[in-house]
Structures are given as C-alpha cells and as structure tokens.
C-alpha cells in the first residue's frame, strides 16, 4: 500500500471510514512516515529550542497525536508532562506502547472536547489541520484549552491556508492570540511525491 495511504486519508470525506483507514495503516504508519522523511518532529524541536522557552515539566497537549512520533522527540528533549489526544483507537494503542505520554485521550478535534479550558502550557497540532481530517473551526478549541500566555503551535499546508479557511479563522481570533512567528516553508514529507509545502504557525494566548 505504501505511498497510497497518504492520498487515501487526505481525500476521505467520511470520519467513520477515516478511522477505519487509520486502523488498517496503524501498524506500518511509523515506518512509512519515517521513510518519507517526516519533518514535523524536527520542526517542533527547533521551535522549542529557539522560539519559545518552557520548562521541562510544562503541560503539553499533543493534539492529533497519532502514534506519538512528535512526542518521541519531546521525550528525547526531557519533556515529561505530555497529554496525547487522537480520534484513532488503533493509533493510540501504538502511542501507549511507547510509554511517553502521561495520559492518552480518544476524542475528535472536529467538535468540542471534554478537556478543561485554559490548562495547557503548549498545544501542538501537527499534520492534523488539513484536508480530510480536521477543519479550521478546531482552532477555537485549541485556543480554548491553551493557558493564558501559553503557546499554540500549528502546522498548516500553504495550499489550504486560505482555501480551507485557516487564515480567516486565525484572523478572527486575533483578540485571543498574538503571533510569535511563522516559519519558512518546508516540505513535510520530502520523500513522498504527494507531500505539500507547510509552515509552522506559533501563537501565544493573550491574557483573558
């Protein structure tokens, strides 16, 4: 199946079928993304080393955590208070086996979660805000659970930033968040022919 999985999950319109696709892909997901040069862990590491300064016990939400590839890098950096949230039970099983999360939650970001408001020092959402997955409205939910003065780190493909309403949703929430930095474009999966150019968007939640 290999490289076809990415096209399948990004073009799927049904959330039920999307969950089934990830169930079927879960066992090979890590190997596939590593083979494709998965860039988000490195991008997140750069941000946490250069753009924002947080303590190693900071409470971090890995929103749309999948199998925990980004959290593995966080763990290597000695962050020890990571909460993972994902829609796929099968992806979460693999994430749990890595023993790098303090807690794992099976929920969708496409609607309001059960997470308490204003609780995370950092909210990460990489490779999730995209076609076939989670739309722009989820940005409101990600802001809601971020602490005052906490950080929101999002990856968004350039091709959908305006087209799918992410630019508009971020601008509508300017009263809640201030821009820290937007990265230079990078290819999220450089070894996959379908990969798009993305940017990392870093915001800080304003005092409420």
Please provide the spans of the model-predicted regions.
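Residues lining the SAM
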Residues: 126-127, 155
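A short glycine-rich, Lys/Arg-flanked "PGG" loop and its adjoining helix->strand segment in the class I
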Residues: 137-148
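Class I S-adenosyl-L-methionine
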Residues: 177-208
């Amino acid at each position: 199946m290999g490289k076809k999985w990415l096209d399948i999950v990004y073009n799927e319109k049904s959330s039920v079928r999307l969950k089934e696709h990830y169930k079927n892909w879960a066992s090979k997901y890590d190997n596939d993304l590593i083979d494709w040069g998965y860039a988000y862990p490195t991008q997140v590491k750069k941000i946490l080393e250069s753009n924002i300064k947080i303590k190693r016990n900071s409470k971090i939400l890995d929103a749309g955590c999948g199998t925990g590839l980004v959290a593995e890098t966080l763990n290597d950096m000695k962050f020890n208070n990571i909460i993972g949230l994902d829609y796929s039970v099968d992806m979460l099983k693999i994430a749990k086996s890595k023993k790098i999360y303090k807690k794992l939650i099976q929920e969708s970001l496409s609607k309001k979660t059960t997470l308490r408001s204003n609780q995370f020092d950092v909210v990460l959402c990489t490779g999730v805000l995209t076609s076939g997955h989670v739309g722009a409205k989820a940005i409101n939910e990600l802001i809601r659970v971020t602490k005052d003065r906490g950080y929101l780190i999002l990856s968004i493909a350039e091709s959908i930033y305006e087209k799918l309403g992410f630019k508009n949703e971020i601008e509508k929430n300017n009263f809640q968040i201030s821009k820290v930095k937007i990265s230079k474009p990078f290819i999220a999966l450089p070894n996959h022919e379908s990969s798009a150019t993305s940017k990392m968007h870093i915001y800080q939640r304003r005092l409420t």
